[in-house]
């Protein structure tokens, strides 16, 4: 009976070690669940970015309005006969003077 108790205690310790420290342990499962959650967030962010880029590509394929808007905003282009006015904020001037 004494040997049976010792064997059972050793088996219990071996199983507990595997549960807490071994492969597939509670700690590794928790860590994997965290990684899965992070990856799901990243996938959702990238999916939204892809959706926006696809919408932009479709808009550029559809007509001149999107191309014109892009040229105006990104490249600073203006139409023939238009006048471009740049409004400078006074606080920007003061900030630049104080840095010198």
Curated annotation (Swiss-Prot):
Belongs to the FtsB family. Pfam families: DivIC (PF04977). Residues 1-3 are cytoplasmic. Part of a complex composed of FtsB, FtsL and FtsQ. HAMAP family: FtsB. NCBIfam families: PRK00888.1. This is Cell division protein FtsB. Residues 26-73 form a coiled coil. It is a single-pass type II membrane protein. Residues 22-100 are periplasmic. The chain crosses the membrane at residues 4-21. InterPro entries: Cell_div_FtsB, FtsL/DivIC. One of its GO terms (biological process) is FtsZ-dependent cytokinesis. PANTHER family: CELL DIVISION PROTEIN FTSB. One of its GO terms (cellular component) is cell septum. Essential cell division protein. May link together the upstream cell division proteins, which are predominantly cytoplasmic, with the downstream cell division proteins, which are predominantly periplasmic. Keywords: Cell cycle, Cell division, Cell inner membrane, Cell membrane, Coiled coil, Membrane, Transmembrane, Transmembrane helix. It comes from Saccharophagus degradans (strain 2-40 / ATCC 43961 / DSM 17024). The lineage of its organism: Bacteria, Pseudomonadati, Pseudomonadota, Gammaproteobacteria, Cellvibrionales. Its main location: membrane. It is found in: Cell inner membrane.
